[in-house]
Amino acid sequence: MSRAGTWLKMLGVGIVICVGGPALVEKLRPTDAELIQRYNPELRERSMREGDRRAQEFDDYVTKLKEWSKSDKSIWFAAKEMEEKRLAEQQAIQNQTKEQARIQREEMRKELMGEK
């Protein structure tokens, strides 16, 4: 076989692999609807219930990743800083709630002592 024939044969094989492989995968892979039909009824119901919430959580996560990737730092460091910031805010809210409860208790004591 000539050199050109070998090249044409290899080109044909390459095209079959590059086009046929993904086409075969698409044909064999089930659609989302087919997968959901295979679920048992409990899983199907739970999937329908929690689907919107999970989609929203994923969208929020992707948004955070985009925000973290804008900084010059590694995504891991940016995520850690965001987590530390969230924990600090949570701690501040908790401290504020404790302080309000303490002030309320003191006011109640003063009222009780004034009434006696």
From Swiss-Prot:
It comes from the Eukaryota. The lineage of its organism: Eukaryota, Fungi, Dikarya, Ascomycota, Pezizomycotina. It is a single-pass membrane protein. The keyword Transmembrane helix applies. It holds the Pfam family CBP4. The keyword Transmembrane helix applies. Residues 99-116 have a biased composition (Basic and acidic residues). This is Assembly factor cbp4. Residues 77-116 form a coiled coil. Belongs to the CBP4 family. The chain crosses the membrane at residues 7-25. Keywords: Chaperone, Coiled coil, Membrane, Mitochondrion, Mitochondrion inner membrane, Transmembrane, Transmembrane helix. It comes from Emericella nidulans (strain FGSC A4 / ATCC 38163 / CBS 112.46 / NRRL 194 / M139). GO terms for cellular component: mitochondrial inner membrane; mitochondrial membrane. Residues 90-116 are annotated as: Disordered. InterPro entries: Cbp4 (IPR012420). One of its GO terms (biological process) is mitochondrial respiratory chain complex III assembly.
